[in-house]
């Protein structure tokens, strides 16, 4: 009996895998990774929900700020734009063009009742209010992406630079030239004065005086 119990214990020991610290660490790491993935997915979902809610709130605020007359004119303008773009860009048959031109006339006319205009708008573009909101959201996203991608660069102001000119020493030269000229003029004047003020001295000669006449 004891031998049978020993054999069963050995078989059970061989069947159960050995639990090592490395296996425990790997299992905990796998669990941690799964938690991280779940958190990242939840964060992305939350961001998408927040963006959707903000876009819906902005659209609701814009529509609530507008009066019913303004909202109607805006919707009419949008439907008219869509019809004009379709006529310009899309290839349509003559029948479709006639229908589009009639719809444009009814939408632009001031005598047509509002009920008829709304019927035409629904027949042309279906749920036009939903499409207008979608277009607003697209434009809003484009503006946000442009704002994020745009980089503001500060331009360094040009500092003023002052240059000194080398002053030429011309004045002292002029002074020296003037002094030299005055000195030379003074010397010439003195020389002429001395020549003029010399006394006349009579020198005697031994030659006899006689008139030089031919007789």
UniProtKB/Swiss-Prot annotation:
Q: What is this protein called?
A: UPF0488 protein C8orf33 homolog
A Pfam family recorded for this sequence: DUF4615
Enumerate composition-biased segments (Basic residues).
29-39
Please report which protein family the annotation says this sequence is part of. Answer: Belongs to the UPF0488 family.
Signal peptide per UniProt: none
Region Disordered: start and end of each range? 1-72, 87-111, 158-199
Which regions are flagged for Basic and acidic residues bias? 40-63, 167-178, 188-199
Q: Which InterPro entries match?
A: DUF4615
Taxonomic path: Eukaryota, Metazoa, Chordata, Craniata, Vertebrata
Q: Which domain of life is it from?
A: Eukaryota
